[in-house]
A protein has these predicted regions:
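Residue-level signal for inorganic ion chemistry
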Residues: 31, 67, 89, 170, ...
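ALDH superfamily catalytic-core signature
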Residues: 231-344
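General structural feature for long, well-ordered alpha-helical segments within catalytic domains
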Residues: 44, 48, 52, 66, ...
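Structural signal for hydrophobic packing residues in well-ordered secondary-structure cores
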Residues: 53-56, 60, 75-82, 86, ...
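Glycine-rich phosphate/pyrophosphate-binding beta-alpha loops
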Residues: 42, 153, 278
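Short, solvent-exposed beta-strand edge segments and adjacent coil->beta transition regions
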Residues: 32-34, 92, 142-144, 254, ...
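Rossmann-like NAD(P) dinucleotide-binding subdomain of oxidoreductase/dehydrogenase enzymes
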Residues: 79, 123-267
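N-terminal Rossmann-like NAD(P)+-binding subdomain of aldehyde/semialdehyde dehydrogenases
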Residues: 1-133, 327
């Protein structure tokens, strides 16, 4: 049976890629291949940048209140398509239903923030800052921004943290969707178009490191926003800074818990489990180090074991599942190796 080949989204249209390189997309709960995403060619990435640049003058001229109205429409459409978006996140990322729904809801909340763009864009002024001088600060859009998206939050990060505020403030955007979880991004692209976002204001591609470097080096891209691992974040920040671009790189965290002897044991363990096991541990909020006061260490471990054994493991689309699969096989094998190391 032929496998669905995803398109890329540029200038308001979904287009077939001319690439020879494709990424297999899997349902983590079953392992089945559910489609293929293109590794867009350099020409296709340049096409997306050009579309964003061409759309910028007209979009920045749209009054802020009109851009805010479009954000309200996007928010409305997210709610209308909540079930479809949640299923997409669950089936391509592996989050259980409640986690996938939370991912989409966070995208909605980021969009709600963007509806307040008239307030966000307000400047400041100070008359007579010194004799004969007044100071005035304006906030203005800059141009084309690029968002580089991780695999673990296909909805919240690109369409909650990145795109809404960026374009609501009058900028345009090229989103590099995660190559293993791009389907949700394409659903959001449809929503943005239906909401009335003009062609070229938002563009979505999937590509490799080489094409990302094209984005980082391109003079028409004024800023970069990235979420992902620290090694990659450092390289992106260095390359973007060398090209004179604004850049924010949110990298991986190392979270710790310190449990004292007087802690409420059941509630504390429940919090530790939620942090460590939520999203199968594939998030920057995941707890990776827990230090317990010696006086309660044995009781803590017993309670942790008890609560962990009660977690229902199951497929992501089953609304009763509380722990879903690792997103892709490479990380699954790394987790098994770490477990073996711990047992040894």
């Amino acid at each position: 049976m032929a496998v669905e080949k995803l398109q890329y989204f540029v200038n308001g249209q979904f287009k077939d890629s001319k690439t020879d390189t494709w990424y297999d997309l899997h349902n983590p709960s079953t392992g089945e291949i559910t489609g293929q995403a293109p590794c867009c060619t350099e020409e296709e990435v340049l096409e997306a940048i050009a579309a964003a640049k061409a759309a910028y003058p007209g979009w920045r001229a749209v009054p802020a209140i009109k851009r805010a109205q479009i954000m309200y429409k996007i928010r409305e459409l997210i709610m209308e398509h909540m079930e479809e978006l949640t299923m997409s996140v669950a089936c391509e990322n592996g989050k259980v239903w409640g986690e996938a729904e939370g991912d989409v809801l966070k995208a909605k909340e980021g969009t709600e923030l963007a509806t307040q763009v008239p307030s966000l864009m307000m400047g400041e002024s100070l008359m007579d800052a010194s004799r004969g001088y007044d100071t005035v600060k304006y906030r203005e859009p800059l141009g084309v921004f690029a968002g580089i998206v991780p695999v673990n939050f296909p909805a919240m990060i690109p369409f909650g943290w990145m795109a809404p505020t960026c374009i609501a403030c009058g900028n345009t955007m090229v989103l590099k969707a995660a190559s293993l979880t791009p389907k949700t991004a394409m659903l959001f692209a449809k929503i943005y178009k239906e909401a009335g976002v003009p062609d070229g204001v938002i563009n979505v591609v999937t590509c490799s490191r080489n094409e990302i470097n094209t984005i980082l080096d391109h003079p028409d891209v004024k800023g970069i926003t990235f979420v992902g691992s620290t090694p990659v974040g450092l390289k992106i920040y260095q390359r973007a800074a060398a090209a004179g671009k604004r850049c924010q790189a949110l990298c991986q965290a190392k979270n710790h818990a310190l449990v004292m002897a007087d802690a409420a044991l059941e509630r504390t363990v429940a919090g530790v489990i939620n942090s460590a096991y939520g999203c199968a541990g594939q998030r920057c909020m995941a707890l990776s180090c827990c230090v317990v006061e010696e006086a309660i260490a044995d009781k803590f471990v017993e309670e942790l074991k008890k609560q962990a054994q009660q977690i229902k493991v199951g497929p992501s689309w089953d609304k009763s599942s509380k722990l879903g699969p690792i997103t892709y096989e490479k990380h699954y094998k790394e987790v098994l190796a770490d477990i073996d190391k711990g047992v040894a």
